[in-house]
Amino acid sequence: MINEDIIYEYEHNNRIVIIGDIHGDIRRFKDILIDAKIINKNIEWIAEPKNTIVVQMGDQVDSINRDRTLEDWEVLPDIEMIYFTNLLHKIALSKGGRVISLIGNHELMNTIGNYSYVSPKSLNNNYKRQELFKPSGTLSAILSQRPLVVKIGQLLFCHAGLTLRHLDILSKYNKDVSYINTIWKNFIKNNAILAEDKEIFEDIILDGDGMLWTRDLDKKGDLIKMLEKLGCVYMFVGHSVVEQVKLINDHVWYTDTGISRAFGNTSYQYIDIFNNQINIKDVLA
């Protein structure tokens, strides 16, 4: 296991590949990585430049078909996505790169015992699922290293989206955005949530308008204020499915194009940023 604190901020990087919600579809995830020339079919890191960063926007698990008429496509249980991205991060680090897997609302749901989107193949039984995902459980060593929010240069990444209200809550307690990652790490390692952290945990992480759940981001004026406070130009989010990657209010990129076969799509997209140029890439199933 890679033993490091959760890193919030990275320097500007010449190449960042951004992949939306995966929901257990390890095959399509690999297809994107191969299409982007991040790995080859032998899972070797071939990215150029070598220090390329891959950001996966969360929701690696919960692979139940959203349309029950879809054929069963799942070969491996959804947790294999967590293990694979953990392995890939180790491979990337050995070559100078990095794979950042964000925490999404579906990872959180599983840690609190909500398995309503888990496929029959992945569920196996409730007890085993609980032992995997519970705080201090089997997966906690991996999940405790994964951030809820990351900044790379002037780019902000989180699963559903940060708002000015979230920053105001943090400011009330003299905390910066990186503290959200600290609270998550304490929670998943089964450390007590401090009394002064309770509002941050409940309103920013657990709440339906929190950064893992919201579908109602700030209007443009407040969005710009929020980004300026963090020294950012763009925010990248997953969570809300869109037919194609799109830019909203000039500052928010929506990246979740329903990649997983659980959504029944025959094409999907990812983002490849190279030398500050944001490129939207199409993949046909």
What are these regions (language model features)?
Residues 1-285:
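Feature recognizes metal-dependent phosphohydrolase scaffolds
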